[in-house]
Amino acid sequence: MELPGSGYFQTLALFSVTFGGFAVLVAVFRQMIGGRLSDFDMFFIRSTLLRSFMAAGCSMLPSLLALFEISPSIIWRVSSLITGLLLILFTLTWYAERRAASGTPYTKAFRVNFLLQMLTAIFLLAIASGTILEPVPGYFAAAVTMIMVTAVIAYMAQLRLLLQAQTTGKRK
């Protein structure tokens, strides 16, 4: 059965993987210029790849569930539940790992990103429960898109920190 929004989810999955690959290339180029990768560089690469692959996998999840010929309502609830739980797990570990990797205070952009991710996770869990919102493709698509929006925001903020460290010579 063809789910509504399948083309969008396939495009989002492709974009997510492409974004992850591009982000890693920037870190590799930085390594070529500056030598050994720092703890923050490794955090940067890992978190970008994890978020990109999480968005890609969650984008493909409804199509996978549709192969089992279950009802669309269940597909959107299960997809929302799994994506919401993964996002909470990622966000909480990302918060702790960033502190360990950089040893610097959280920036305003980081805090905003953290809040957006947690709100997105809560939105997904609300979809999964079906009590506040009816589980439909549009809500799920908006939430997974927000995961990629927060990925871009985080990438730009982390890239700025990497470039500042490169110009000041302060690499952890």
Positions of the model-derived regions?
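Juxtamembrane helix-loop boundaries in multi-pass membrane proteins
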Residues: 10-14, 37-57, 103-120, 170-172
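N-terminal signal-anchor/start-transfer transmembrane helix
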Residues: 13-33
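Generic alpha-helical transmembrane segments
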Residues: 16-20, 50-58, 76-94
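Hydrophobic alpha-helical transmembrane segments in multi-pass integral membrane proteins
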Residues: 56-64, 117-134
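Membrane-water interface at the C-terminal end of transmembrane alpha helices
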Residues: 91-95, 124-131, 149-165
